[in-house]
Amino acid sequence: MKLYLAPLEGITSYIYRKALYQCFDGFDKYFIPFIRAKQNLNFSGREKKDISPENNSGMYAVPQILTRNADDFLRTANQLKEYGYQEVNLNLGCPSKTVVTKGCGAGFLARPEELEQFLDRIFSKTDMKISVKTRLGMENAEEFPRLMEIYNRFPMEELIIHPRVQKDFYKNTPNLEAFGEVLAISKNPVCYNGDIFSADDFKRIQSQFPDVECFMMGRGVLADPSLAREIRGGKAADQSDIRRFHDLLYHTYREEVSGDRNVLFKMKEIWFYLAPMFADSKKYAKKIKKSERCVVYESAVNELFANCRFTGTQSK
């Protein structure tokens, strides 16, 4: 069994990944949120920090690339190889409209002929391992048999499938029937991704698909950072675990990010997922959300930890 951390844009940065690794770990691979491949070979300052080997020490990190241009993909992959990476991931799953309208992410799935040419070029021109993260299609799962014909032509490190279509975003439920059909015909190793929010969710998916050996989790980890540890038979997070995790995240953001506003933007996003682990936390979560200065934020966080009973995943 292998467990992977999904790449979540704007959230699972190197700061988040390092804190998660130090406090909980449990993951075999940590996927880095997508890098937009471009003709300009220079990575941005943020991208350089995210892919820096120093900031991913001890982890098997996999950078994700977003593009529909094969040459741009290859340039970016080769540059990542110089950083020491052995594997890259192609993003064919992002449902964001700003990405899809450019024909990237899940938007690329609507162009199967172009996608096939793209894959043919990148797999023939690099010796790096390439995994693919995909959805079932743009509009409906009936699009996927054609996509599978394409995917089966190429020696992927893994095919990571989120069994929703683009228009679902994160609504509805994963199409497990379609996933099972895909699993039966895939010539590549398949990884399951989608709606694993608890150890029970994991057991349910694993029992339904016993041949699947790899599972990717994203939002479930944001809501319970100890989820991978729990799945592996370890203990669930307690309040002190979450406090340690929070403090490490917060202090690192203060060191790495300039300005209270930017630091608090990051932390408020984290609390959107963490607050439900505490009973009767709405009042304090609101204070956290309204805080505009770090000193006010710190006071609100201390109040929440002091006054709200920690219930963990049961309060979701």
Residue ranges and their predicted role:
Residues 1-316:
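Flavin-dependent oxidoreductase catalytic cores
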